[in-house]
Amino acid sequence: MAVNEENAGNEVHRDQPGPLKRNILWVRHGTTLWNVEKRYLGHTEIGLLPNAKEELAPLHEQLSGVSWHEVYCSDLLRCRQTLEQILPDAIGQVKFDSRLRENDFGEWEGLTYDQLKDNPVYRSWIDAPQEVTPPGGESWQEFTGRLDSFLQEMLLEGRPSMHVDEGRESTIVVVTHGGVIRYVLSRLIPGLGFWDTHVVPGQAIQVQLDQQGNQWFGSRVTFPPIGL
């Protein structure tokens, strides 16, 4: 992913030791009733299931061994509730950002594939989401535009402090949604398509980014780390 450094307000200190890196942990929110019922869930405010604490307990334990320096979270309820379970100590420092919301499915919110499968507009959207917008919903360009804006801003923030120091690396944690994670991974990892990533509720995917010039190149790494 290319990052525009002009007028960014952050100078790249190329004379500092070590390459610029980012470790980003992308977390999908826990399970909601609509996830279980396989309904399209975009901007609708629905909370997690009553067993959220038990569902997210393994991720909470895994994150206890992670050194994080920034936490971002979608402002939707299911993500805020997820954050409370997995990183309660971060609540006072988290940056809530509406750009991290799931795609807005408009009139298709709350509907299932079986309810929509005979709709010709829906069929066209499935085949070419870049060209078709759900009625009353968000276009592909609007969805990806806000996510590109978030990525650009996140990668430019705090740059000098993120040089690798004696092999120690801190992590950025982002709590968000399945469609968001699919898109950002397709932007950050060369050759990865939108549908190539499968992420279930309550799962974390770690991406390591290395900067070459004004480009960031990502690779997926094992999470949790071996031995954690």
Tell me what each language-model feature is:
Residues 2-4, 22, 27, 31-89, ...:
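Active-site-proximal alpha-helix that buttresses catalytic centers in soluble enzyme cores
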Residues 2-22, 103-114, 156, 160-170, ...:
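Acidic, low-complexity terminal tails and accessory targeting/binding regions
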Residues 47, 90-98, 192-201:
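Short hydrophobic/aromatic-enriched beta-strand-loop microsegments
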Residues 66-99, 208-228:
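Conserved histidine-centered catalytic loops in small-molecule metabolism enzymes
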Residues 68-75, 161-166, 171-175:
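Short glycine-rich phosphate-binding loop at a beta-alpha junction
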Residues 85, 183-187:
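Active-site signature of alpha/beta-hydrolase-fold catalytic machinery across serine-
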Residues 86-146:
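Phosphate-handling substructures
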Residues 178-182, 210:
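GST superfamily/GST-like fold recognition
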